[in-house]
Each structure stands twice: as C-alpha cells, then as structure tokens.
A protein has these predicted regions:
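Seven-transmembrane-like multi-pass membrane architecture, highlighting hydrophobic TM helices
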Residues: 20, 25-31, 101, 133, ...
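Alpha-helical structural signal with a strong bias for long, charge-/Ser/Thr/Gly-rich
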Residues: 80, 85-111, 115, 302-333
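Universal eukaryotic N-terminal targeting presequences
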Residues: 1-2, 343
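Short non-domain terminal segments
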Residues: 46, 60, 73, 83, ...
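Leucine-rich repeat
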Residues: 93-149, 153-199, 208-214
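Conserved phosphate-interacting/catalytic interface
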Residues: 200-343
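Residue-level detector of alpha-helical recognition elements and their boundaries
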Residues: 28-29, 47, 167, 236, ...
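Skp1-binding F-box subdomain of Cullin-RING ligase substrate receptors
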Residues: 3-91, 95-96, 150-153, 172-183, ...
C-alpha cells in the first residue's frame, strides 16, 4: 500500500518513525532504503550524546575505532563532485582547523545505550589530498550532518568550513543542542562555521583573543547574535582581562543596547544573551536603562533594568548585571532576554 502513495504522503508518514524504525524499514527492500536515504535530512536523526575532536587516543577510556577505507565506502560521488575532484584537491586541505595539531586529530562520539555510555573514535584523513580521501570524508561528514548531538565540545579543533563549502556548499549543518567553542585563532573561519554550519539550542563561545583582533570581527559576532532562528541562547565568555579587551566589551554592550532600542525589527535577535567579563573596568550602566533596581546579596551586586524599543515601545528586553569579586579578581555577567508581551 505504501508503494502507491504520493511522495509527500509517504514522507508525512515516515516522519512519525524514530531512527531505529527507519533503519528497520530500510532493511525491508530497496524502495524504502532509497526513499529514506533521499529524505534522511527531513526524518528522525541518529542521536548521540556528545561529539568533539581531540588528539588523545585514550579519551573516554578505550573507544571503538572506526577507520574507514574508500573501498568499504559504498557511496559513489555525484557526477558534479566526480568531475570537480577527479584528481583530488589542487592543494591539500585539512579536515579540521587547529593551530598545533591540524595533521593529527580524531573525532570522538559518545552514544548512550540503556543508560551506559559507549565511545567511538572516528579516524578520518586529517589532510585531504586524493579522490579517495574526498570520498571517505564526504560520506562520513554527510552521516554526521544527519545525526543530532546533545553536547559538542570544540576546544583545540573545529571542522574546516572551507572544506565543508567545497564539498557541500553552505546548506549542511551540525545539529548540536549545547555546543561550546573556544577561540584563540582562526576567528574568521570559526565564525563562518558558526554562521553557516551549526544550529542548536545553546551556544557558548570562549574568547582568548586580544581586543584589536576582536574589533575586526565585531560585526560578524553581532550577526551571530541576530541568529535567533538558529540559537535560543548564546553565552560569550571573555577571558582576556587587558585594558584594550575591556574597551571592546563596552563597545559590544553598547552595540547591543543600540540595536535593541532603535531597530525596526528585533525579532531575529537571539532570545537570551549572556556576556561574561573577567576583571573589567568599572561597569557603566546605559543611560537608556529603565525601571532600574539594585540589590546586594552575599557580596554580589545585582542590577536589573529594561531597555525599550523606540520604534515599538511594547518590545522590551530585560537585563540583569551581576557584579562580584573574589580571590581571582572581579567579574561581570550580563544576562539579556526578550520580554514577551502578555496576552
């Protein structure tokens, strides 16, 4: 009966199946296998607990090694890719970005079965040169794009957005619910990865950069904060405590205030934004702050206030500035979230 149904009806039905059900259906016959493969980006995804990239072979104990070879990858390149990369890349290109370990990295995946963690180590070519390398990387990256991950942790490595662009264009994205990214180099490429190839619920970015570098990419960072359709919450951690970095933090704060108060459309802004600064200079409250309330609790100063939009006064954002001091210096955390109009 399913065979004769229109494609859109079959797709609607298959969307009710979980990943295990889809795997079972694929094994019944070639028709269902090809149909599910064709629409796998719209159907249930294989779920993993975590993904990260590391050089530590013993990470997670003794993970199961997955080291594919091109002869075992039953996946022909499309005619377009076959023609484009028949002789491999003109210049070798790394799978991941890393200042120190670009030639040596492993993808670690964690999956939970019956409340027990299982670890996998996916060893792909670190430097892609040949057509066979391209075939392996294309196949497995495409599989990862069609999975979902609860956590992602990218400290020393990140997938190379230039490689993704060459193989897939900008259409492919990793689905990671809670993702943490550290930035101490290649900021432009990492921002490109976040904008084009990452989607999830929460994103945390730890910056270990000087102010002069951050300023160059301030507009790109602000564009990330306007991706409310991709992220529900973004936390920016500024670990550099130099005077120059403090100046940039003030500029970013003022840029957010200006957008909230004057933009004709605030709907695209990420609903919750957290800025955390270490050892900042004395924080200056915006003159546009309304309904200011200040209180101290256990040595921590809390300043709550609102910023209204002049184009539409019903659009309001609430702020909470949390200022504290300790043995390791002072810190300021600013939480910004959109107030939704009560019906």
């Amino acid at each position: 009966m399913l065979y004769s149904l229109p494609t859109e009806i079959k797709l609607y039905i298959f969307k009710f199946l979980n990943y295990e059900d889809l795997c079972s259906m694929k094994q019944t016959n070639l028709h269902f296998r090809d149909f599910i493969n064709n629409f796998e980006g719209e159907l249930a995804r294989e779920e993993f607990y975590e993904i990260d990239i590391d050089v530590d072979l013993m990470r997670g104990g003794f993970p199961k090694l997955i080291k594919p070879e091109s002869k075992n990858v039953d996946f022909p390149l499309s005619e377009e890719l076959e023609k484009k990369f028949k002789n491999g890349f003109t210049q070798p290109i790394p799978l991941c970005l890393s200042e120190q370990f670009a030639h040596f990295s492993y993808i670690f995946l964690t999956k939970v079965y019956n409340d027990e963690a299982c670890y996998f180590q996916l060893q792909l070519p670190s430097i892609i040169k040949s057509k066979n390398d391209i075939k392996i990387v294309y196949f497995y990256l495409n599989k990862l794009f069609n999975c979902s991950f609860e956590y992602g942790n990218f400290k020393d490595f990140i997938f190379n957005p230039e490689l993704i662009q060459l193989l897939f264009g900008n259409a492919k994205q990793f689905y990671i619910q809670k993702c943490k990214i550290y930035i101490d180099n290649d900021i432009g490429k990492i921002f490109g990865f976040i904008l084009n190839n990452l989607v999830g619920e929460k994103l945390r970015i730890d910056f270990l950069l000087e102010d002069d570098i951050l300023k160059i990419y301030k507009n790109t960072l602000f564009t990330i904060l306007l991706n409310g359709d991709k992220f529900q919450k973004i936390k920016l951690m500024f670990d550099n405590d130099t005077k120059k970095s403090n100046n940039y933090k003030s500029v970013l704060y003022e840029q957010i205030i200006e957008h909230i108060s004057t933009s004709k459309d605030c709907s695209k802004m990420v609903p919750v934004i957290i800025l955390k600064f270490f050892n900042p200079k004395k924080f200056k409250l915006s003159k546009k702050a309304e309904k200011v309330e200040i209180k101290k609790l256990n040595g921590v100063k809390y300043t709550n206030y609102q910023i209204s939009n002049i184009q539409n006064p019903k659009v309001k954002f609430s702020f909470c500035n949390k200022e504290s001091s300790g043995d390791y210096g002072s810190e300021v955390e600013i939480k910004i979230f959109k107030e939704f109009e009560k019906i």
